[in-house]
């Protein structure tokens, strides 16, 4: 299967006349269509709600789009909670799924109406100390340990993950929480990452639904919701088939009716915390070829680097690359496509067969809409790029400006050296 950019070269040329590369570009049309499809796929469940994983793409303008389709926010830090509040999230719109959590963050999450999802049984004491009480609605994260298997092999290894409670711990936690005043409970689990199969959610649902039945029977706790979290992936490689959210939703419905409904639990709401699935394919990193180097290998240097997209350097992750305007030319040149960091792993592609690339060519690096800009950093003094939203009508706007040296040096603003650091700022613009 061929990966097609959601933007044309003509439109990119128009955008780059106003905004210099590199930048992250987002597709409003794709985001909306996908959010609508998710909502329709789970419309059978009256209480269904998607809590978008803010960590994946922390931009309020993009979150605003998802809110139009009923999405809330899944937060894991104080600043993500602040963003959720700023975009208008109300009580019940925020899921606080954190770990190793400072008490002040539990307090803030509760103050703004967030549902606290406990990662560990010891956090019961932390929450009670922070709030002076146990919230009436609370959730616990489950980790069954071992490996999580599916029809096409091992999906992931929860036993090695730092997250969640054991089976024994979650039963004890429910009993303790109930005795301390909790009235409605949720359970949460994240057992595999970036799964490209329609079977993952239904299989996870079976595990969670069966656990919910046992928890309600043995502890007397009322299960209000089951949070399937994230894990639905995207096809980074052209030969991968995308997940079908409608098939996934129907698969979860079938298990729901087989396990929960016969136990009188047909009122349990299904929650999700999708990030990559919601945004990944609808963002790309646009960069320009600025150098070519011919040594022991053929290198193309671009004006983006791992600061703009860390995944290839950090995980060896594959991101497809389109050389704009040369989509139909033969891929008969083998390149390493590199950034300028003083690290040899700053490579967007290694030994990648691509059309001949000339200096000045625009390259689109696909599927950066989640865990792209969000994982940026400032090593080597590099500055993070702008974010641009391409609207359905073809217009575009900046939704985050690029960093400047003033941003980079901002934490020195209380010292005399601050003005010296910026004395050449105007000359470098």
Predicted feature locations:
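A charged N-terminal "starter" segment
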Residues: 1-136, 172, 177-179, 183, ...
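Short acidic, glycine/serine/threonine-rich loops at helix termini
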Residues: 63, 85-86, 106-108, 127-130, ...
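Glycine-rich, aromatic-flanked loop segments that form ligand/cofactor-binding clefts
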Residues: 132-147
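Active-site loop/helix belt of alpha/beta enzymes
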Residues: 144-291
């Amino acid at each position: 299967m061929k990966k097609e950019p959601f933007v044309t070269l003509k439109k990119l040329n128009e955008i780059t006349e106003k905004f210099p590369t590199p930048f992250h570009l987002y597709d409003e049309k794709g985001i909306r269509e996908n959010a609508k499809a998710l909502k329709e796929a789970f419309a059978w469940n009256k209480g269904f709600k998607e809590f978008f994983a803010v960590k994946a793409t922390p931009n309020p303008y993009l979150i605003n789009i998802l809110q139009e389709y009923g999405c809330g926010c899944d937060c894991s830090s104080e600043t993500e909670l602040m963003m959720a509040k700023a975009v208008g999230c109300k009580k019940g719109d925020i899921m606080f799924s954190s770990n190793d959590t400072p008490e002040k963050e539990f307090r803030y999450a509760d103050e703004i109406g967030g549902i606290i999802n406990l990662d560990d049984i010891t956090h019961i004491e932390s929450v009670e100390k922070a709030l002076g009480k146990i919230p009436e609605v609370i959730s616990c994260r489950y980790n069954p340990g071992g490996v999580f298997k599916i029809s096409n092999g091992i999906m992931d290894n929860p036993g090695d993950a730092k997250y969640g409670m054991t089976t024994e711990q979650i039963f004890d936690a429910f009993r303790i929480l109930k005795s301390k005043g909790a009235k409605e409970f949720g359970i949460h689990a994240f057992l595999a990452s970036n799964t490209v199969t329609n079977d993952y959610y239904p299989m996870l649902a079976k595990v969670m639904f069966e656990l919910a039945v046992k928890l309600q029977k043995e502890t007397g706790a009322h299960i209000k919701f089951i949070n399937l979290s994230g894990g639905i992936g995207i096809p980074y490689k052209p030969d991968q088939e995308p997940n079908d959210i409608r098939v996934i939703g129907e698969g979860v419905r079938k298990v729901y009716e087989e396990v929960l409904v016969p136990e009188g639990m047909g009122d349990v709401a299904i929650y999700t915390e999708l990030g990559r699935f919601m945004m990944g394919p609808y963002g790309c990193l646009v960069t320009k070829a600025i150098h070519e180097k011919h040594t022991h290998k053929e290198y193309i240097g671009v004006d983006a680097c791992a600061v703009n997209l860390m995944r290839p350097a950090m995980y060896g992750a594959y991101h497809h690359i389109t050389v704009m305007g040369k989509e139909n030319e033969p891929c008969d040149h083998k390149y390493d496509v590199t950034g300028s960091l003083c690290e040899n792993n700053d490579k967007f592609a290694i030994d990648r067969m691509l059309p001949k690339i000339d200096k000045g060519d625009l390259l689109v690096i696909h599927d950066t809409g989640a865990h792209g800009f969000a994982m940026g950093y400032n090593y080597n003094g590099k500055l993070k790029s702008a974010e641009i939203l391409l609207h359905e009508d073809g217009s575009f706007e900046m939704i985050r400006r690029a960093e400047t040296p003033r941003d980079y040096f901002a934490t020195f603003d209380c010292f005399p050296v601050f003005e010296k650091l910026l004395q050449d700022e105007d000359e470098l613009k």
